[in-house]
Every structure is written in C-alpha cells, then in structure tokens.
Design a protein with these regions (language model features):
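N-terminal basic, low-complexity leaders that serve as flexible interaction/assembly modules and, when applicable
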Residues: 2-139, 345, 375-391
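N-terminal start-of-chain detector that recognizes signal peptides
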Residues: 41-45, 90-91, 157-160, 236, ...
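N-terminal small/glycine-rich loop or linker at the start of catalytic domains
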Residues: 63-94, 124, 129-141, 145-151, ...
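The substrate-binding groove and active-site-proximal loops of carbohydrate-active enzymes
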Residues: 94-97, 155-166, 334-338
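Glycine-rich, proline-tolerant flexible connector loops at the mouths of alpha/beta enzymes
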Residues: 119-136, 149-162, 189, 245-263, ...
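A gly/proline- and charged-residue-enriched helix-loop-helix capping module
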Residues: 140-178, 183
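Active-site loop segments of alpha/beta catalytic cores
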Residues: 165-391
Length: 391
C-alpha cells in the first residue's frame, strides 16, 4: 500500500452519486443515430466495439454511468518515467508523427493509472506542421514559427492541409485504438484562436497582444487566418474520428485573454466551424479553455456537447451559467496534486459534490498534469474516484 493510500479518506464516506439521473428515455435511446453511425467506418469502436457503453461515453452524453469517469489532460507526458524513457533523444514533433511511438505514449497512462479514456498524444501545432508551415517546438520555450503570420498577404500564402498529409495521424489512431481495447480514445485539436495566436506572435506569449490587436486593426486578415486554423483543426479531428476516436476535445488554451465581446465577434464563429466539421459523426465534442468563466455560455453556443471547466470556477457555478444544460468536465486544481493526501482528497470530494449539480460529470484536472507530479498520486486518485462514485 502506498503512502497516499494509507492517508486516503475512505471511499465509503459520504459519496456523491453519479450526478443527477437522466430522463429514462435518455438512458434508453441509442448513443448515435443510424445516420450518424453511417458516417463511421464499420470497424469504428462506436459501431463494432463496446466504447458506446463505457462510463466515459455515457457521462459525456449526459447518461448515468457505473462510476464517475476520469481522465487527465496531459496524462501522457513527462510525469511518467516510461514516457521519459521512450522519448529520450526524440524531438516532440517527431514523436507525435511516429505512429507506433504516439500510440505507445497515448496508452501508457491508461495502462498505469486505469483512467477511463486515452487522450491522443499530439500537439496543437501538428496540423499546421502537416500543412507545410515551418514550425518547431523548442525545449523550454514551446512552439516557434520560422515566420509569423501578421498580414493578409501572409495569411493567403499559407498552404492548405491535404488529406494525404494526415495519414500518420490515422495510422497512429488506429494503432492506439487497437491497443486500448474497450477503453475509448479522445482525439483533440487546438482551437482556432489559440492556434492563430501562436501564428501571429510567432511563439508563446503572456498577453497575446498581437492577435488581439490584429482582430481590430485588420479584421479581414484575422478572420481569414482564424478560418484557416478552423479548417485545419476540423480536418485533423475528422481524421482522428474516422480512424477510431470516440470523442474529441477542442483546446482553447489562450481564450481567457479575451473579453466576451471580442470572443463572440472574432472567435466564436471559427470555433463553431471546427466543431461543425465533425458534427455529422455524432461523437461528443468537448470544449475547454483556461480562464474562460465569462465565456462558457458562448463556448457552448459554438457547438460543444460538453464544457471543460478550469480550476478557477466551481462546477456548480459553471452549471448555473450554462442553465444546467450540458455535461461538465473538470476541475481538480493541479496544484493540489503535490499538496499531500489530506488536502488533495478533501478538494476532490468538493469537486465531486460540485459536479453532482450538472447533468453528468467527467472528472479531470482544471489544467494539465504538472511534469513534476508523482505518478502514484494519480494512480491512487483514479482508484479513489472510482471507488467513491461506484453506484
């Protein structure tokens, strides 16, 4: 028994059950319509496997589940010693575009922690890289473009992403799905604003001043750039779904830098374009951003089926903002992972109680797993959540 287990509160203590029960007809109706299923390949897990009945897919679609499902953003990464071993000497983008390596990295946290879903190991700049944009990930800094995109001429010079360029993604997804078995895979892409912000800045930024200025100073260039980012993200997600992903998440890491007015005027339509690109498949579409409490209704209106909530806003407050209309995901504070078992589990109990207000709740962090996290903390946390919320 680990030290964390010795100090873990009993999972038999007052445990919130899996959220408010769905209407009986919700639980009985098929996860996907015949028309939606027709868009998926015959071998897709939602057609040929048990993914549709998994706790993750049940919760993502607002249905009761056998326990509160859990996965972690950045669960595949530097917190795992096995990840560090297989990545040794291999640049990030090369790892993402090597199908067998991307598949292995995706499966590692499922194998170790017994989380309820894998999240595809990739990066938000992969679609632009595959399109032919000269971008690299610099260790200790992040994505850096050889040439920032700051004028309408720059935007119109951008190459379009071809379907054949996505073949490594399809191959990686197919291999991952086979390795995961009954555990569903979540695909992902960077949202148009966050991707476009990187492209305008040429790299990471604290305030995203250049893209926010561009929206107002040159709205034509901004909208063309954001539309390009929306198209490539849509293609990226479609390829993942067609190869076997059972849900997708659109990450808008930097949307919290925007006011609601600018979000609705300059961003929402482009996120909607990406989410609309995969609507026909019927898979759950999760939308997550950091610092986006004021934007949650607008993010839902863009077409999200599930809203991810960061650690700054209680889930009950998010549920109120969204009129109780949408499943929620989140929102354990990553800082608590290193705060000791007593503080962590008290916080987790609060998150579970808050999540019970929503139509359904998928447990996650309110941001990514910090690289310094002790993996055993996550393994014990998954076990605790499963035991505490089992019906």
């Amino acid at each position: 028994m680990s030290e964390n287990q010795q100090h873990t509160p009993s999972a038999e203590s007052s445990a919130p059950s899996q959220t408010l029960p769905a209407h009986p007809t919700d639980a009985q109706r098929p996860l996907l319509t015949d028309e939606q299923l027709a868009h998926l390949p015959a071998q897709h897990p939602l057609r040929a496997g048990t993914a549709a009945s998994s706790p993750m897919l049940q919760a993502l679609t607002g249905r009761p589940s056998s326990h509160r499902p859990v996965w972690f953003m950045r669960q595949a990464g530097r917190s795992l010693p096995e990840y560090r071993r297989v990545r040794e000497g291999i640049p990030m983008l090369e790892a993402c575009l090597t199908p067998e390596l991307a598949a292995e990295i995706t499966v590692q946290p499922v194998r170790r922690h017994k989380v309820d879903a894998g999240i595809f190991f990739s990066d938000i700049v992969i679609p632009m890289k595959l399109a032919g944009v000269n971008v690299d990930i610099v260790p200790g800094k992040g994505p850096v473009l050889d040439r920032p995109v700051r004028t309408l001429e720059d935007v119109r010079a951008l190459p379009e992403l071809t379907e054949s360029a996505l073949d490594p993604i399809r191959e990686a997804i197919a291999a991952t799905v086979e390795m995961l078995g009954d555990t569903p895979l979540i695909g992902f892409a960077g949202a148009p604003f966050t991707v476009a912000a990187y492209m305008v800045e040429g790299g990471p930024s604290r305030d995203h001043l250049r893209p926010r200025t561009m929206m107002h100073a040159d709205p034509a260039a901004w909208h063309e750039l954001a539309s390009w980012a929306a198209r490539t993200a849509g293609q990226f997600l479609r390829a993942q779904i067609e190869a076997g992903a059972s849900a997708v998440q659109l990450f808008d890491s930097w949307a919290g830098s925007l006011g609601e007015g600018d979000y609705r005027r300059y961003v929402q339509q482009h996120s909607a374009e990406t989410l609309e690109a995969v609507r026909e498949y019927g898979v759950p579409r999760i939308h997550f951003g950091t610092g986006t409490a004021a934007l949650l209704p607008a993010m839902h209106e863009a077409g999200a089926d599930v809203i991810g909530v960061d650690y700054r806003l209680p889930l009950s407050a998010a549920n109120t903002l969204l009129n109780g209309a949408v499943p929620l995901q989140g929102n354990i504070d990553p800082a608590l992972l290193a705060a000791g078992p007593e503080s962590l589990y008290a916080h987790v109990d609060d998150v579970l109680a808050e999540g019970s207000a929503a139509p359904s709740h998928v447990v996650n962090l309110g941001h990514g797993v910090p690289p310094t996290t002790d993996p055993q903390v996550l393994t014990d946390l998954v076990r605790y959540i499963h035991e505490k919320t089992t019906n």
